[in-house]
């Protein structure tokens, strides 16, 4: 086995893996990621690193806090969700700005046997959610309306099973995140909202989570299929992650 096969096996077993002080360049970041499959198209909303359209550039400070400060799984509203993400810290605050990941395997295992059975055949609508706000930034002008309509048409919604089975591990997991799941199919609005509220609370348990305090040059890789993540907005200084 080559080193990338070994990294993939470690990822499948641990869901999130970390590399300290890599000082990896954008080109090396791209080349590393390409060893695990075809890269996803440029992000529908966020800007990219100059010269590298497939690398998302995230910049936050006290005047521009992260808009991903709720539990989410990356891009579940797309028809083809990227199976993994690789994030590199470029500039980070001395205090704050941590990222948390939560296990969707553990969330499934904590369900009662009755709920596991009830949820087995349920499907959910995953919607682009607050990304509409970015698409609609210039709605006063014609270009803003066109951009929102284009985004809704291309990335608007996707239907996914609430209980999924991981294609590699074969283990079941709870395929829910509060940011992008908009409705439970077959349920009324009130029923759907009640189920979503229960699942949001159910999945936010410290015992299922890991918290990472970033240092410049750190790199994290996670399995998008079986993790939810949250960026904290408790840092006053600038933080940049490319």
Which stretches of residues belong to each language-model region?
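Non-heme Fe(II)-dependent double-stranded beta-helix
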Residues: 1-99, 131, 138, 156, ...
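Short, surface-exposed secondary-structure boundary micro-motifs
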Residues: 22, 225-226
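Histidine-centered metal-chelating micro-motifs
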Residues: 72, 226-229
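Double-stranded beta-helix
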Residues: 100, 104-219
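Short active-site-adjacent structural elements
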Residues: 184, 222, 229-230
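Conserved small/polar residues in nucleotide/adenosyl-binding loops
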Residues: 231-240
């Amino acid at each position: 086995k080559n080193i990338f096969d070994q990294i993939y096996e470690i990822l499948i077993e641990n869901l999130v893996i970390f590399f300290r002080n890599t000082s990896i360049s954008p080109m090396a970041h791209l080349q590393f990621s390409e060893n695990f499959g075809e890269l996803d198209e440029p992000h529908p909303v966020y800007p990219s690193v100059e010269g590298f359209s497939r690398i998302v550039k995230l910049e936050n400070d006290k005047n521009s806090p992260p808009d991903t400060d709720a539990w989410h799984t990356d891009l579940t509203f797309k028809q083809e969700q990227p199976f993994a993400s690789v994030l590199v810290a470029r500039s980070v605050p001395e205090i704050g700005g941590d990222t948390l990941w939560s296990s969707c395997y553990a969330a499934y295992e904590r369900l009662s046997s009755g709920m596991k059975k009830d949820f087995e055949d349920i499907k959910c609508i995953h919607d682009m959610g607050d990304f509409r706000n970015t698409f609609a930034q210039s709605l006063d002008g014609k270009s803003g309306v066109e951009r929102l309509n284009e985004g809704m048409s291309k990335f608007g919604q996707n239907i996914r099973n609430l209980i999924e089975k991981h294609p590699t591990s074969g283990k079941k997991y709870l395929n829910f995140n509060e940011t992008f799941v908009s409705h439970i199919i077959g349920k009324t609005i009130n029923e759907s909202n009640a189920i979503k509220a229960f699942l949001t609370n159910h999945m936010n348990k410290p015992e299922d989570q890991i918290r990472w305090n970033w240092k410049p040059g750190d790199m994290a890789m996670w399995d998008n299929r079986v993790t939810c993540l949250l960026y904290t907005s408790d840092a006053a200084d600038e933080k940049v992650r490319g």
